Design a protein with these regions (language model features):
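Cysteine-centered catalytic environments shared across enzyme families
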Residues: 1-309
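Conserved glycine-rich, hydrophobic/aromatic-active-site segments
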Residues: 65, 111, 222, 304-336, ...
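Residue-level preference for the first positions of well-ordered beta-strands
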Residues: 231-233, 335-338
């Protein structure tokens, strides 16, 4: 997980200011690339290939393509590296940044639908004078841009544009999930293409077969996302989603640690902490408890609003708890944490969904809407909170495309 910025609206000075405004997204390296009017910048949180060779902005061996990238590619993508290493001059041991860049060099825009991971990135084509921007299918990571009068600027967060460039928030647009964009620098044109749609179909299978398939897919998703050169941990809130992820991780990660945030134990209410303790005891996993009170919430509201770039209580209330949890995770030496986000949307767990029968078109469309709107609320808020609180990357296996 990292922070990116760039475009032909930035200057060397303003992009450094933008990177400083989003430095909480990565403290391991901060570098800038310049070519005529094009400037690209990157704050790195090193997770795969910790060497300096994997720092960004990253340029291919010919000097034509340069990438700034925020995200991770999963294990399933390694097969492409084995193929591409035979054709291109890789300089890193296992950098997914280099793999992603050569995926684009080889397959161009076709690569977007081939990618398996969470990502937001931009690639500058020096020869054709184009900037390509892309975001993963569900929008796990935030990505914004400003385009006006032949100028383009992009950043991982709104504050990376509003402060350094003095751009008004209402003029900033979202790079949409499942889309890629191509900015033609010379004729000042911005194209937008949708490369993926959530399947709109209902498959009828016996209940036992459905349960078996879901279990297998979740297990594969967790294993697929277990790619890291740094230790990983897990969020254990006590809910069924985080319990499932934690249980599967415990079978693969030695000395796994879990984290929970709560306002204290209440035996009558049996809140998150109660069930998190029960689950950790059953799985024999150490549980780090982060306890906050009303005073903490009130004194940290301003910081939370700044972190998530939203003042709505539905966004601020969970984020105000995620910030201290992220800080606690960071203080224990972790950069990567797994969580159960996305399960309610994937499985249609919200109460209003049950207003329809499962075969009704309205029911099916409501579930698709939940998934397609995830990036507007939960995903963006959680990512920003976890990065601001402790510079921690959140992985969410329930949002594996196969599920």
């Amino acid at each position: 997980m990292c922070g990116i910025a760039g475009g032909n609206l930035f200057t060397t000075d303003t992009i450094k200011e933008s990177l400083d405004d989003t430095k909480h997204r990565g403290y391991d390296a901060q570098l800038v690339y310049e070519d005529d009017d094009m400037v690209l910048g990157h704050n790195r949180l090193s997770i795969q290939d910790l060497s300096e060779n994997a720092n960004q902005p990253f340029t291919d061996s010919t000097g034509r393509y340069t990438i700034v990238y925020n995200g991770e590619l999963w294990k399933s993508m390694l097969r492409y590296r084995n193929e591409l290493e035979k054709k291109y001059d890789f300089i890193t041991k296992n950098s997914d940044t280099e793999l992603l860049l050569y995926m684009f060099v080889e397959y161009k825009e076709k690569c977007f639908e081939m990618l398996d991971g969470m990502f937001s990135f931009a690639i500058y084509d020096r020869e054709e004078q184009k900037i390509w921007m892309g975001r993963d299918w569900v929008g796990r990571l935030p990505f914004y841009y400003f385009h006006r009068k032949g100028k383009l600027a992009f950043s991982s967060e709104r504050k990376g544009l509003t402060k350094s460039l003095d751009v008004r928030n209402k003029h900033i647009k979202v790079v949409l999930p499942s889309h890629y964009y191509c900015f033609h620098i010379e004729d000042k044109r911005l194209e937008k293409v949708k490369y993926y749609s959530v399947p709109n179909r209902i498959v009828e299978e016996p209940k036992d077969e459905i349960v078996k398939n879901i279990r297998e897919k979740i297990e594969l998703a967790v294993d697929n996302e277990l790619i890291s050169d740094v230790p990983v941990c897990t969020i254990l809130s006590g809910g069924i989603d985080s319990v499932i992820i934690t249980y599967l991780l415990s079978k693969k990660v030695k000395n796994l640690e879990a984290f929970v945030v709560s306002n204290g134990i209440d035996e009558k209410k049996k809140d998150d902490l109660y069930y998190a303790r029960k689950a950790s005891e059953f799985m024999k996993i150490p549980l780090n408890e982060v306890i906050i009170d009303d005073e903490y919430v009130m004194s940290n509201l301003e910081d939370t609003i700044y972190a998530v770039e939203d003042h709505k209580w539905v966004q601020v209330s969970p984020a105000v708890a995620q910030l201290p949890m992220s800080k606690a995770i960071h203080e224990k030496g972790y950069k990567v944490v797994f969580g159960g986000e996305g399960s309610d949307e994937i499985f249609g767990s919200y109460g209003h969904i049950f207003a329809w029968k499962w075969k009704d078109d309205d029911y099916h469309q409501a579930r698709i809407d939940l998934i397609e709107k995830l990036h507007e609320k939960n995903l963006v808020r959680t990512n920003k909170a976890m990065m601001y609180g402790g510079t921690v990357e959140l992985r969410t296996p329930f949002l594996d495309k196969t599920l």
